[in-house]
Amino acid sequence: MRSILFLLLISSSVFSQRVITGKIVDKENSTALSGVFIRDTKSDNWSISDKDGAFQITIPYLEDIVLNFSILGKMESNIALKNNENFITVFLEDNTLRLKEVVVTANKERKYSELTLGTNAINNVQAFSLDDVLKQLPGQTTTDFNLNEFKNIVFRTASKLSASNANKAFGTSFVMNDIPISNNENMQALNPNSGLADDFGIKGNTFTNTNRGVDLREISTNNIEEIKVIQGIPSAKYGDLTSGLVLITTKVGNSPYRVSASIRDATSELNLTKGVKFNLNNSMNFGINYLDSKADPRDNILNYERINGNISWQYKNNDATIKNTVNTSFRMNLDNSKSDPDDISAQVIKNEKKGFSISNNLMWKPKNLWVDGINVNASLSYDRQFSRRDKWMNTSPSAATDTQEEGIHEAIIVPSQYTSVSTVEGIPISTFFTLETTKTLTNKSNWIHSLVLGVSHRTSVNRGEGRKNATQEMLNFYTLSREGNSTIGFRDYSFTNSKTEYQISTYFEDRIFKKFKDERILNLDLGVRFDNQMGNISLQPRVNSSYTLNETFRLRAGLGLSSKAPSLNQLYTGDRYIDKLIGSGIYTYPGVYQKAWIQTIITPGDNLNLKPSKAYRTEAGLDIKLPFASVNLTGYYNKLYNGFSGQKVPVYRVIPKAEIIVTGTEIPNYNIVGTEKFYYMNNSLTNDRSSEDTGIETTINFKKIKSLNLDVSMNASYTHTKDFSDVKEYESSASLTSAERYGVYNPQDGIMDSFTTSFNFNYHIPAVGLLISLRTEHILLQNTKTQTSNYPNGYLDSELVYHEIPVEDRTNIQKYGHLIKVRNETQSKIPNILHNLHLRVSKDFLNGFSASLYATNFLNLKPYYYDDYDNKILSKIAT
């Protein structure tokens, strides 16, 4: 099918070309600018200016040409050429606050629904990490400033702390310089299938982010040139995602030394960047960032440190047909929770990550081949992760075992006081490679087809020592004391037991442009992506379109499918060890003996049947350009299905029945007296999670009030979310003698909605380089409702055979009162509108020095509300 389409395009096409030449000049001093990157916005053909600022670019069509000009330190410029204009002179201005127009908010692109944040928008919030920048987007809110827990983000959803939210965060893709940032190989979890939450964290702050997306704290903003956010339908070029795409472009090129320091509460940050131009064809940029953040300025108990460094080298040949960029970076992140002298039982946590990445981006315009361009991207990422938790235990004596074999074993008697130590060591390694070709064709009717064909390959592997015991040989043991308990015993597990996860993909895209006689314009991107993710094959069509009716109205629409592969931590969890104390527990005769026996049951643990989660995304929009404002309105419906979900299913094993023999002061022993059924809950991961997000968002940019030098903009977002699962819930019968062993219930569905607005007021005086920005946030609606299912649909008997209960009998207390649960439906909402206001004052001086003061919640608003239990709650937006 692809070959037929390709031949049809060729047969109806003519190779119309137009050569554009020109010169690029620095507006400040009228000197020529070399190394400026020139890109055709439709075909992605490109060129680079020479030492005299001159350039030449071949355009494979004749009319409606728009060229983009960009270089580090200058304001990016788009210039539309007249149909008879083949030579242009371009003036680029310094990107400072002395520009006549400064954009400090997310800019809605005129093609589809993507949002772009430039340098000024990135600096608008004095960001300490990428998380601070993305909070400016519609539907997001600024929460308490806290760098002592991992940060992720989800777009276009009202779900917060839920399994669906974790799925969506895991499915949000971050791509830096055309290289995806992967979290698939992160396995820093103590017991992936145990149900134990927050393996490494303290006081509600979770450090590790397995299965929950990229930790945005690790990405500093000092070296970022531009951020593009696609909340709708991504290009077919991008895969392994379900919930959104963030494209990051870093700085490369000549620039002066830039030293910056930021201080906020007990957080301080220091940045150094410099760009060097060795000659006409070679330039280098390097930067280093250090951040130190304490949870409390009065002590150093909870602390986060980050050190990032990067070196970028860019080369181009003399005739500007090859552009190659090599990026290397190193990183160190440390979460450190030290011992609290006032709390001997407090956990001591250390979570450390050190690593490096190297990538190469090659752009080549071959002269003697049929294609216009060939792009090759490759990368390698290597990290060493170490997580450790120390906790002082003061409990009654207990028994444990470290055996890795089934059967009855003599237990280790754990003293009532000891230090429990849990450690996980990982070495995540990821690679990525993509090869892409481009070709632009036009036909006699001036239809422009920009064709893209590419293949990609990515791998994820972890070669760490894994979960292991440290010192004292009695660490983090969990022992069952009764039947039915789902707690799992801890055992060593090497991550080398996991296999390499691979993804092989190919994609094709036809980007169509047509301008009609009456100024109507059609943009249509037709793409398809083929993914092979660990043997799971999927075909993902994606469509984006826009139709400009006139200078006032433009329609937009798009739809597409995408998928996200499971992580290694979800696939490879290790065997589950169920430890059952036999007899009456620990047998003690003071001064003579202390004995206990544990029966160990082993069940396979890996979730190798887990498949990629998938998403179906649609959106439709309307852009209106009025004399006083530009309005962008977008409605969307997104569905996540085959999402990752935990499941607990009752199982039983027939095991030997042991009888303990105790005779006076003699050492106790046991005899096998038959068999018995042992019931327990088996934990696993399945593809049974689903979620639907329906919403509408708008962005309005008002015309500048020139008499006041005031720019005003606003955005609003409403989202309705429904989370649901196909995983049944099981609960033991309240009657030990009944034939019904477990009740079977529907899962708890969640319904949420959220309505937020934000206003931006920017007062700008270019002559003195002064900018005063006021950003307001308003939460008008935030509701959460969790539906309960107290009445069983059926039950499992002693053989765990399912029996359906007739609908009319499910509420019958006489028959099934021992299975009916008493659990109220939970619902929460904010009774009043919550407000937050942030102020920034920035000044650029002529000597290159700049200063900025940024205050969040500068009016010190303290919005309280009361929950369903009449507890007074302080909203998290009070930063």
Segments and roles (model prediction):
Residues 25-29, 39, 68-74, 84-123:
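Short, acidic, small-residue-rich periplasmic hinge/interaction motif at the N-terminus
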Residues 39-41, 45-52, 101-128, 150-154, ...:
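N-terminal periplasmic "start-of-domain" segments of outer-membrane beta-barrel proteins
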Residues 87-91, 130-133, 152-154, 175, ...:
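N-terminal periplasmic accessory domains that precede
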Residues 134-200:
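Extracytoplasmic beta-strand/coil segments of soluble accessory domains associated
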Residues 179-230:
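Short acidic/polar hinge/loop motifs at secondary-structure boundaries
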Residues 406-411, 415-521, 693, 742-747, ...:
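Outer-membrane beta-barrel transmembrane domain signature of Gram-negative proteins
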Residues 637-639, 657-788:
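Gram-negative outer-membrane beta-barrel transporters
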Residues 640-642, 778-802, 806-819, 832-833, ...:
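C-terminal beta-signal and adjacent terminal beta-strands/loops
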